[in-house]
Amino acid sequence: MTRETERFPAREFQRDLLDWFARERRDLPWRKDRDPYKVWVSEVMLQQTRVETVIPYFEQFIDRFPTLEALADADEDEVLKAWEGLGYYSRVRNLHAAVKEVKTRYGGKVPDDPDEFSRLKGVGPYTVGAVLSLAYGVPEPAVDGNVMRVLSRLFLVTDDIAKPSTRKRFEQIVREIMAYENPGAFNEALIELGALVCTPRRPSCLLCPVQAYCQAFAEGVAEELPVKMKKTAVKQVPLAVAVLADDEGRVLIRKRDSTGLLANLWEFPSCETDGADGKEKLEQMVGEQYGLQVELTEPIVSFEHAFSHLVWQLTVFPGRLVHGGPVEEPYRLAPEDELKAYAFPVSHQRVWREYKEWASGVRRPD
């Protein structure tokens, strides 16, 4: 028993939280079916992505891969295309690898043992708790950002939530206050409370069903919690991007490396500029590395795309392929009407939209 929960009225708290959840729970597509595979897909999608964004992607993904076996048997390019636009592509690569292992090692049944499930690729403590409690009723804690915020306020925890030790502390608290007869609903209710009521800014304390148990509310410091140390400044990376078409209307694209950021996704040719002339560097790169002669116009647009650890500063140059040798991997000349079949990261989807607007005369370079 931790000092936080030693005198905590857990049964009364469970009752008030679960009664509220029964009344107020959102009608979400992944809540209609407790199939372990579908729960797993939804939890992976919901990592670092808003619920409203996930809903249509989840429905389309399940339509395309309705069973674990269907996803396990799918080609990686097809899976990446189905995920296109959600970002954080390592999530779906790990999921794809993990369901393949489930199919071969466990006969297609998601393991209900926490140790076995946690050994699958990409499955961390939160995913273990969420999937196993919701699908199998296993009493494992599911501690995400919402839950850490709720618990920080409930128990007046001032430790930095970015530290692994703080997460472990919260996991232990959940184990001690959990409704063991219905762990899935309890975990889901805590998450829902953080999403709808105990929000990061301007929490609705007066409407909170568990306000009576909240130490931060009693002390008037709810908005000061949780404590999270600021990250260091992210790296800024200037990129020049070329949209190049040949005389037959085919567009030059390339496949990214099989490891690292945005692995195996397609993109338009690009290079880091480091403050140099982007047009000159692009022409030099394409010419020297791939033996292709290109003619670029002036840039049509510049914009930023942020990742968790860096920011791309993209400048887009339209142009044409004049002549050169055959196009070899990782490059490909794709007919324009076939580009939609390739999985592009969000940043390069925007590159294409900006290019099409420019080409149609909707906008001109500044």
Swiss-Prot record:
Active site (catalytic residues): E43
Residues engaged in binding DNA: W30, R31, Q48, T49, L86, G87, Y88, Y126, E188, S308
Cofactor: [4Fe-4S] cluster
Biological-process GO terms, alphabetical: base-excision repair; mismatch repair
Catalytic activity from the UniProt record: Hydrolyzes free adenine bases from 7,8-dihydro-8-oxoguanine:adenine mismatched double-stranded DNA, leaving an apurinic site
HhH domain sequence ranges: 105-133
Cross-referenced InterPro entries: A/G_AdeGlyc_MutY, DNA_glycosylase, Endonuclease3_FeS-loop_motif, HhH-GPD_domain, HhH_base_excis_C, HhH_motif, MIG/MutY, MutY_C
Matching SMART domains: ENDO3c (SM00478), FES (SM00525)
Purpose of the protein: Base excision repair (BER) glycosylase that initiates repair of A:oxoG to C:G by removing the inappropriately paired adenine base from the DNA backbone, generating an abasic site product. 8-oxoguanine (oxoG) is a genotoxic DNA lesion resulting from oxidation of guanine; this residue is misread by replicative DNA polymerases, that insert adenine instead of cytosine opposite the oxidized damaged base. Shows a powerful dicrimination of A versus C, since it does not cleave cytosine in oxoG:C pairs.
Protein family according to the UniProt entry: Belongs to the Nth/MutY family.
Name of the featured protein: Adenine DNA glycosylase
Gene source species: Geobacillus stearothermophilus (Bacillus stearothermophilus)
